[in-house]
Amino acid sequence: MKFTPELESGVLIKRYKRFLADIMLPNGQEITIHCPNTGSMKNCLFPGEKVWFSTSDNPKRKYAHTWELMQTDQQHYIGINTGRANALAEEAINRQVITELLGYEHLKREVKYGSENSRIDILLTSQNRPECYIEVKSCTLLEDQMGYFPDAVTTRGQKHLRELIHMVELGHRAVLLFVVQHSAITSVKPARHIDPHYADLLEQAVANGVEVLAYKTALSPQGSLITSACKVML
């Protein structure tokens, strides 16, 4: 996934009201940009360090700029825009990078499913194979060299796990795919210390046949690309 036009940089001042962030441009100008991340962004906010943002030419947007990456002083990149995860996953499936998901003929996005008014991120189908329901999650929380999900209590994420369990019960295939958007993360673990109910549900999901995958993303101001699998610690 290439960033077009190219990203511009600034320095983070603060994030506030969840969806906004103030940054300072290289010329000293302060601007407000959109923060496309509903999580707590724990351990992802470093005031005074570099941010990278995209620019939209849509005149109807209140904020023309969108925060895409955080670049730490240790030169690690963090994908701030969680909305990119689904597109990265779709691209990786089409490039046959995610080997566990090979062999399907058709891919659909945002398909209604389940019993709790949900939409699945990706649905893979093929003749003579069970449908494959894939829920995509962006993992950015780094603690003690370990990646954790979620970074805040997520009732929505809990609902998605229940839906995946239900799909397996109906005879389908169900996959939880963590797209790792932090260059320092090498393995992923459920954040029981943050959302114990989610961790319990994930254990239940695995016991009932839901598959859990995690794949690393190469991040840079030029573009982002899912590259390889990383370990899931359950």
UniProtKB/Swiss-Prot annotation:
HAMAP family: SfsA
Cross-referenced InterPro entries: SfsA (IPR005224), SfsA_C (IPR040452), SfsA_N (IPR041465)
Family, similarity comment: Belongs to the SfsA family.
CDD domains in the cross-refs: SfsA-like_bacterial (cd22359)
Domain of life, source organism: Bacteria
Protein name according to UniProt: Sugar fermentation stimulation protein homolog
Organism: Shewanella frigidimarina (strain NCIMB 400)
Record-level Gene Ontology MF annotations: DNA binding
NCBIfam families per the UniProt record, alphabetical: sfsA
PANTHER family linked to this entry: SUGAR FERMENTATION STIMULATION PROTEIN A
Short name of any one Pfam family annotated for the protein: SfsA_N
Gene3D superfamilies xrefs: 2.40.50.580, 3.40.1350.60
